[in-house]
UniProtKB/Swiss-Prot annotation:
This is Natural resistance-associated macrophage protein 2. It is found in: Golgi apparatus, trans-Golgi network membrane; Early endosome membrane; Recycling endosome membrane; Late endosome membrane. It is linked to Defects in Slc11a2 are the cause of microcytic anemia (Belgrade or b). Homozygous b/b rats have hypochromic microcytic anemia due to severe defects in intestinal iron absorption and erythroid iron utilization. InterPro entries: NRAMP_fam. Residues 1-45 are annotated as: Disordered. Ubiquitinated by WWP2. Glycans are attached at N336, N349.
């Protein structure tokens, strides 16, 4: 729907920030031509607990830096960083070390830096507009593309949830010395999710502190493994800062691509843009907005530095201890250590292949039972923390895209059911190798969903009607465009490699049809993104059918006078 300048928007009331949003129009007009937000009345997210409380920012005279203010803004970045430490990332890390040694640490560093820059865009969108990414997508895209985009993001969230369930189930199985079967661990994760989700009833800061506690557990457990194995520090530094991969072949290249897919999570853009709304920022004051952007970026830098160090711990442990090890060598060590898991590995001369489960077993064989149990505790912390942030992501995405308010209980029931059923079937009817093998497929799935977060975040943060003076400059636009192109190229590589392994004509046909539909939708989003980046000649005077217009009518989001229209 495109409104004439004289046409009035029905006064539906406030549209989305649930708090200090009345001042948004003073600095940030945003537009919509496909649909307008439906009001929820005077209620303030009645089913959501996360935004029931907003953290006040201490008032001080302006200074370049204040530790008090940084502490007040600390929280969202560490919750966001959980996605960089989920079981899928841990599995990617250990496989990277076992397959390529220290050679791919620079890829991990580069992927983390790229992730940081993308999180910066997500946080800025939430701070400047008072809306998270899903809400902005709801206001901008027409109905059909909006629904498709929502389904793609939900698919990414469910895939991530499956990884968390798998990781938690394996950790419980290891901690119980196999007494709790894998399907039992899967069922336990259903119950513990509800327990942990009640924590935010005790206050936002306590919830954020609990996440900090889980990150600390991961740092201590994986740090213990690092100290125990004693990897070569010179090799670690060389792998981190020298971008090369001598002697690398297809497995190493595929692993490098897998690192990118594991580190940069699509749903994390939606999550971070929503989490920053938990701080009280007067968006009518440009100085406060700039200050919030600065402190959120500093916090994100600290949080992702911590997550990077933890990931380096895991890569280095497996690079030092298990790079180029054979199954025969591992079996011999496990038998000498009287490990009950010696039969887990084939007694042949092929290169050792590890996953989350086997990784814990070989650590126990080489460095004692303590290493196995401490590894399992770290994996459990990774799975549980990711479970909670995944639930928040799902809630924000559903509420934003569909303007639908669900209780968190109902939301967990839905997503957990979808994630649990296939995972439970594999756990019951297959072995642990098939269960952990799902992580590789799910990392590919996450990578394929990346454009559905990267393109919208780049589009909207580049639009001046949305971001006012905080829109992306030419440098960010060029860098973002190159990044999206690179990610899409990586995805196509993933698709080609994966399809080649299918080995069946019917599957080739299905893959071809899905690939065409996938690329078509990515092209659609990319087209709109290029117009937003300034290539207005692409709109051909007809882009209003797509959701972007050469002269988009905009309205002041969340203002009391919702009928006021202005034109760019």
């Amino acid at each position: 729907m495109v409104l004439d300048p004289e046409e009035k928007i029905p006064d539906d009331g406030a549209s989305g920030d649930h708090g200090d949003s009345a001042s948004l129009g003073a600095i940030n007009p945003a537009y919509s031509n496909s649909s307008l937000p439906h009001s929820t009345g005077d209620s303030e997210e009645p089913f959501t607990t996360y935004f029931d409380e907003k953290i006040p920012i201490p008032e001080e005279e302006y200074s370049c830096f204040s530790f008090r203010k940084l502490w007040a803004f600390t929280g969202p970045g560490f919750l966001m960083s959980i996605a960089y430490l989920d079981p899928g990332n841990i599995e990617s890390d250990l496989q990277s070390g076992a397959v390529a040694g220290f050679k791919l640490l620079w890829v991990l560093l580069l992927a983390t830096i790229v992730g940081l820059l993308l999180q910066r865009l997500a946080a800025r969108l939430g701070v400047v507009t008072g809306l998270h990414l899903a809400e902005v997508c709801h206001r901008q895209y027409p109905k059909v593309p909006r629904i498709i985009l929502w389904l793609m993001v939900e698919l990414a969230i469910i895939g991530s949830d499956m990884q968390e369930v798998i990781g938690s189930a394996i950790a419980i199985n290891l901690l119980s010395a196999g007494r709790v079967p894998l399907y039992g661990g899967v069922l336990i994760t259903i119950a513990d999710t509800f327990v942990f989700l009640f924590l935010d009833k005790y206050g936002l800061r306590k919830l954020e502190a609990f996440f900090g506690f889980l990150i600390t557990i991961m740092a201590l457990t994986f740090g213990y493994e690092y100290v125990t194995v004693k990897p070569s520090q010179s090799q670690v530094l060389r792998g981190m800062f020298v971008p090369s991969c001598s002697g690398c072949h297809t497995p190493q290249v595929e692993q490098a691509v897998g690192i990118v897919g594991a580190v940069i999570m699509p749903h994390n853009m939606y999550l971070h843009s929503a989490l920053v709304k938990s701080r009280q920022v007067n968006r009518a004051n440009k100085q406060e907005v700039r200050e919030a952007n600065k402190y959120f970026f500093i916090e994100s830098c600290i949080a992702l530095f911590v997550s990077f160090i933890i990931n380096v711990f895991v890569v280095s442990v497996f690079a030092e201890a298990f790079f180029e090890k054979t199954n025969e060598q591992v079996v011999e060590v496990c038998r000498n250590s009287s490990s009950p898991h010696a039969d887990l590995f084939p007694n042949d001369n092929s290169t050792l292949a590890v996953d989350i489960y086997k990784g814990g077993v070989v650590l126990g064989c080489y460095f004692g039972p303590a290493a196995l149990y401490i590894w399992a505790v770290g994996i459990l912390a990774a799975g549980q923390s990711s479970t909670m942030t995944g639930t928040y992501s799902g809630q924000f995405v559903m509420e934003g895209f569909l303007n639908l308010k669900w209780s968190r209980f109902a939301r967990v029931i839905l997503t957990r059911s979808i994630a649990i059923i296939p995972t439970l079937l594999v756990a019951v009817f297959q072995d642990v190798e098939h269960l952990t093998g799902m992580n590789d497929f799910l990392n590919v799935l996450q990578s394929l969903q990346l454009p559905f977060a990267l393109i919208p975040i780049l589009t909207f943060t580049s639009l001046r009607p949305v971001m006012s003076e905080f829109s992306n400059g030419i440098g960010w636009r060029i860098a973002g465009g190159i990044l999206v192109l690179l990610v899409c190229s990586i995805n196509m590589y993933f698709v080609v490699v994966y399809v080649q392994e299918l080995g069946h004509v019917a599957l080739y046909v299905v893959a071809a049809v899905v690939s065409v539909a996938y690329l078509g939708f990515v092209f659609y989003l990319g087209w709109q993104c290029l117009i937003a980046l300034g290539l207005s000649f692409l709109d051909c005077g007809r882009s209003y059918h797509l959701g972007l217009t050469a002269r988009p009518e905009i309205y002041l989001l969340n203002t009391v006078d919702a009928v006021s229209l202005v034109s760019r």
